[in-house]
């Protein structure tokens, strides 16, 4: 080998000896165990006891004990309801048919000589029955079937619902509508009764009973039908009401509630518009604490100042409270004792409110505009800032208010746009409304004018053969056009979900500057606290909502202070408007319930609802709807989103009918479980049930993402490359959206390589060859928030009539 030559390195061949690696054995080493334990120390004492296997006889004995305990609990509940230790058994009679309304319904309930009837002079239709012989008492109320709100309020506090059926049809369309609302709210124990069977020939009674059984078995499985025509049949019905098992409603079992049987208003100011309202009734549910807030259904939250204990108006011992006649015998019919000086002498004050222990009525956080502001800089800092500004040129970009720093860095500069940065600030209040409207309006502007579409839709919906002068007088043409437009938008959203046409008269990067692209909707991160709206400074948020809920429920079970269940009390409610008393004077029921801690505060509530099958009108997001959530009623403009287990949830433009949807609104906190009913008010004042469900949670951090889809058409197709047009209309927009991933309807994925020309054509690369009939899509996302339109005032609905002018959405043609 020459001296200057370099020696080649040895390379091992294929037959090099391979030694076996070291094996640590079947067991892990101590270091591996320490790494897996991560500092955890083994328990020195066994925490869980070994399960002891019981013998067959012991297992049988244990099962018998559990069965006996459950039976005793049910019997104790039955015996406490309607006795001296509990409130009277509250029975609400509801007529499910117009012909089933009877004014003398409760004239049959008194069938024994010793029974006592009390007539309430303040609540229309309330009748109390006291039976000293069996030591039971009942309160019967005939509900007004034409007032849906009153009917639902009475059902919230009722122990038993007495449904009255028509012997011919069972229930009518309005009765079926009331049943849908009652089932969605939560149905307590119920009894079905029919009146008027005596007027039917004997030969036809068996057939009519079979027909009624077929009608009721769809709604009430294994329900027994009772007749209510004689006193003997009424006695059998009352026995069934007293002995049947009580059904519990979750939203009221953890709260104290009461139906006001007497009311008195004492003004506290010179105008007489605000004062102290005294409501008397029986405490139900849980103990009533005077330091808690109380909610009067339909009127708001208030403070209690005092709780009194007046004499029981329906005592089981008639010798104490019942007046005597001249002959010395008991009166069978009596009125409730009036509130006067004699009663006031017997009133005992149970408890008075402690101002230091009372809950606050504050429902919103008052944001501090100076919060987060820095202190005023020193002179040295000001000089340093001036020197820094002299050396650098100020870059001004046209961005919307609330855009984050890294989003603003992506926005390209436009010539002459630097001095117009405040143009978008003037339209800040209309951003959300205009943005949603423009998404749907761009596709309609290119097809033709709105007047031509309206004329064509009129010709389709009202043919010449069916026109009639009297019929046309009852048709609102403007309402018909608006409803048809909603049907078209909903149909378009189902066929082309989230697709939006790129505007030609506006720059796309300005039009969609609040949107962003995501690599993956499921896995890409999204900051929960980024660019929150100002309304989020007004709400309350829990660190752990379900942990707080568990703690509040546990405290409610352990507390033992307050008016006990079954006591007849008078509650003094402070700062109540006189309209509440006027409401009671008109014969409308007043229902009050105590609020749990934090339930007066505003937050973001999420409710899981499903579309009611009896309504198919299009319900667009952010439309004003009426909500019945537990004991509360309010109006709000909700967001609709998909129900999933991911951290981001896609918003829905319309209330879907084929799946469950999560509704998000600003509303006072309510701890679940609670039933939810969603109504939409018509132009004539009627309220239609559009969705039912339950309260999901209270979580302002739930991310609702709105998606828009920009579409383009492949112009020239190579192997894996294609020229796409009609997605953008200028070169700058193509460069701006270049980082966003593309997809096609046939499953291809790709990205933008470069723009071609100045008319928005772009060269794109895909993972496979495109088909000529395929469509190129681009997904853009932004987070959306509900509108703060919460209104606790809900107008009372007009008597409901079924809407026959419904349209099948699949038959609506899109222009």
UniProtKB/Swiss-Prot annotation:
PROSITE patterns: G_BMS1. GO terms for cellular component: nucleolus; preribosome, small subunit precursor. Pfam families: AARP2CN (PF08142), RIBIOP_C (PF04950), Tsr1_G-like (PF22298). GO terms for biological process: endonucleolytic cleavage of tricistronic rRNA transcript (SSU-rRNA, 5.8S rRNA, LSU-rRNA); maturation of SSU-rRNA from tricistronic rRNA transcript (SSU-rRNA, 5.8S rRNA, LSU-rRNA). It comes from the Eukaryota. The keyword Amino-acid biosynthesis does not apply. SMART domains: AARP2CN, DUF663. Keywords: Nucleus, Ribosome biogenesis. One of its GO terms (molecular function) is GTPase activity. It is found in: Nucleus, Nucleolus. Residues 19-30 have a biased composition (Basic residues). Belongs to the TRAFAC class translation factor GTPase superfamily. Bms1-like GTPase family. TSR1 subfamily. Required during maturation of the 40S ribosomal subunit in the nucleolus. This is Pre-rRNA-processing protein TSR1 homolog.
């Amino acid at each position: 080998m020459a001296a200057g030559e370099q020696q080649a390195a040895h390379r091992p061949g294929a037959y090099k000896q391979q030694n076996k690696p070291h094996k640590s054995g079947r067991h892990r080493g101590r270091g591996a165990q320490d790494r897996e334990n991560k500092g955890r120390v083994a328990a020195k004492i066994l925490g869980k006891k070994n399960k002891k296997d019981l013998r067959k006889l012991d297992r049988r004995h244990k099962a018998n004990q559990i069965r006996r305990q459950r039976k005793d609990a049910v019997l104790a509940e039955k015996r406490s309801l309607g006795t001296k230790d509990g409130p009277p058994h509250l029975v609400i009679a509801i007529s499910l048919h117009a012909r089933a309304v009877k004014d003398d319904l409760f004239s049959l309930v008194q069938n024994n000589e010793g029974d006592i009837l009390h007539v309430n002079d303040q609540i229309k239709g309330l009748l109390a029955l006291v039976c000293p012989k069996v030591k039971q008492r009942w309160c019967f109320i005939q509900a007004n079937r034409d007032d849906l709100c009153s009917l639902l309020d009475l059902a919230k506090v009722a122990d038993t619902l007495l449904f009255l059926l028509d012997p011919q049809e069972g229930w009518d369309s309005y009765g079926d509508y009331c049943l849908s609302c009652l089932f969605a709210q939560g149905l307590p124990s119920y009894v079905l009764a029919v009146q008027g069977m005596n007027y039917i020939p004997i030969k036809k009674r068996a057939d009519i009973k079979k027909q009624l059984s077929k009608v009721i078995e769809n709604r009430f499985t294994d329900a027994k039908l009772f007749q209510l025509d004689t006193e003997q049949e009424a006695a059998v019905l009352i026995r069934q009401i007293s002995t049947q098992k009580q059904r519990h409603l979750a939203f009221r079992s953890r709260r104290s509630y009461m139906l006001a049987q007497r009311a008195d208003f004492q003004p506290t100011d010179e105008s007489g518009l605000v004062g102290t309202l005294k409501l008397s009734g029986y405490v139900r549910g849980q103990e009533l604490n005077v330091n808690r807030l109380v909610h009067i259904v339909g009127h708001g939250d208030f403070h209690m100042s005092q709780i009194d204990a007046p004499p029981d108006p329906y005592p089981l011992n008639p010798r104490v409270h019942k007046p005597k006649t001249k002959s010395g015998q008991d009166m069978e019919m009596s009125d409730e004792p009036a509130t006067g000086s004699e009663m006031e002498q017997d009133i005992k004050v149970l408890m008075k409110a402690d101002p230091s222990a009372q809950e606050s009525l504050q429902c919103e956080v008052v944001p501090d505009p100076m919060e987060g502001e820095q202190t005023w800089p020193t002179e040295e800092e000001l000089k340093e800032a001036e020197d820094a500004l002299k050396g650098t040129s100020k870059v001004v970009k046209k961005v919307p208010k609330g855009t984050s720093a890294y989003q603003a860095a992506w926005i390209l500069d436009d010539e002459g746009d630097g001095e117009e940065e405040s143009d978008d600030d003037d339209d800040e209040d209309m951003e959300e409304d205009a943005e949603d409207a423009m998404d749907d309006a761009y596709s309609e502007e290119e097809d033709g004018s709105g007047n031509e579409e309206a004329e064509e839709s009129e010709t389709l919906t009202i043919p010449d053969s069916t026109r009639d002068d009297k019929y046309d007088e009852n048709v609102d043409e403007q309402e018909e056009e608006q409803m048809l437009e909603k049907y078209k938008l909903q149909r378009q959203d189902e066929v082309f979900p989230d697709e939006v046409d790129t505007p030609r008269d506006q720059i796309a990067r300005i039009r969609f500057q609040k949107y962003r692209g995501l690599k993956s909707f499921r896995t890409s991160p999204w900051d929960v606290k980024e660019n929150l709206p100002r309304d989020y400074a007004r709400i309350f948020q829990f660190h752990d909502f379900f942990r707080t809920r568990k703690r509040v429920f546990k405290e409610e079970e352990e507390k033992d202070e307050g008016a006990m269940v079954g006591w007849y009390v008078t509650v003094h409610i402070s700062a109540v408007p006189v309209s509440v008393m006027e409401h009671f004077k008109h014969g409308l029921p007043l229902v009050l319930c105590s609020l749990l801690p934090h339930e007066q505060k505003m937050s973001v509530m999420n409710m899981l609802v499903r579309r009611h099958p009896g309504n198919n009108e299009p319900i667009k997001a952010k439309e004003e709807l009426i909500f019945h959530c537990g004991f509360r009623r309010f109006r709000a403009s909700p967001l609709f989103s998909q129900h999933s287990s991911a951290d981001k949830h896609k918003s829905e433009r319309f209330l879907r009918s084929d799946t469950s949807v999560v509704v998000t609104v600003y509303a006072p906190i309510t701890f679940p479980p609670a039933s939810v009913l969603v109504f939409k008010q018509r132009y004539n004042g009627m309220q239609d049930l559009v969705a039912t469900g339950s309260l999901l949670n209270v979580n302002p951090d739930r991310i609702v993402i709105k998606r828009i889809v920009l579409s383009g058409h492949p112009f020239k197709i190579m192997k894996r490359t294609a020229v796409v047009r009609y997605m953008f209309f200028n070169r700058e927009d193509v460069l701006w959206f270049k980082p966003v991933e593309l997809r096609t309807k046939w499953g291809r994925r790709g990205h933008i390589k470069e723009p071609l020309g100045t008319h928005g054509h772009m060269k794109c690369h895909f993972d496979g060859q495109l088909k000529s009939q395929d469509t190129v899509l681009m997904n853009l996302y932004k987070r959306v928030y509900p509108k703060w339109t919460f209104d606790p005032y809900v107008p009372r609905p007009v008597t409901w009539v079924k809407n026959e002018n419904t349209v099948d959405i699949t038959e609506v043609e899109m222009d």
